[in-house]
Structure formats: structure tokens, C-alpha cells
Amino acid sequence: AAVGVVAYNGYTKSAKVNAVKSNHALAVKVITAQLTRVDIDNQIEAWNYSSKKCELRTAHVNFDSNMGLAFSCLNEDPQYKNPFNNSDNEGAFWQNWDVPNVQQIGRTACNYRSDKDRIDCNSRWGEGANDYETTIIPRF
């Protein structure tokens, strides 16, 4: 039975790691798609705090503001839970450009960096020094 518990624990950790990687890919996809939409028709999907859902609206004039609007559909939506910690009040997505620290395992953090004129997305899935993924989205 002990072997089964070890195998199960390994499976659940692997599933959580895969969920973090999937969330990372989703964040990059959503941000890129929404910023492309801004370039095409000056529209963007953003979280509506009154209706508690994502809705199409006119884009902001600033790139960094539009990044925040695009990401709000993820980081404000309560359906996205931290795969490693369901009671994490920040959820799976967090608007920040830093790599989440080991206390924040399971989070995907994205934000515009004005000092580098780009968007950094970082996701942590473990306690190791290299247990995270980074994607840089250049300004376009």
C-alpha cells in the first residue's frame, strides 16, 4: 500500500505542475490575443467588476494599461485556483513581473515592465531554483 501512496503522490504533484504550465500558456495566449485585438479594432476583453465577468470594451490608449485589462480576465476570475494551494487568496494568476517565490508555488505572474518595455510572465511549480517558467512578450 505504501508504494501506491508514493505513486499517487507523485501523480498528483505531476498533475499540479502540468496545471501551472497550462495556466502559464493560457496567460501568454490571452495577453497576446487581446493586445493583438487592440491593434486590429481598438477593443479588448476586460474584467467587469460589477457583472463579475469578462466583457468587450474599448481599449485604453496606453499599452501597459491594456496589458492589465487583458490579464484581469484571468487574475480577477475566481474560477482560477492555485493548483498547489486552493485557499490562496490570489488564486492562480497574480499581476506582478517577479518570479513567484517558494511560498507562492502554483502562481502565474504577468505584468508590463516599463524599465524593459515588455511583459514578463513567470510561473512557479516547485521549490527548486529552476522550478519556474518565464515567457517574455515584447511590446508590439
Language-model features and meaning:
Residues 1-25:
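Amphipathic alpha-helical segments typified by the pilin-like N-terminal helix
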Residues 13-16, 21, 29, 52-53, ...:
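Context-gated lysine
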Residues 23-42:
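N-terminal alpha-helical signal peptides/signal-anchor transmembrane segments
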Residues 36-140:
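Periplasmic/extracellular, small/polar-rich flexible segments of pilin-like filament-forming proteins
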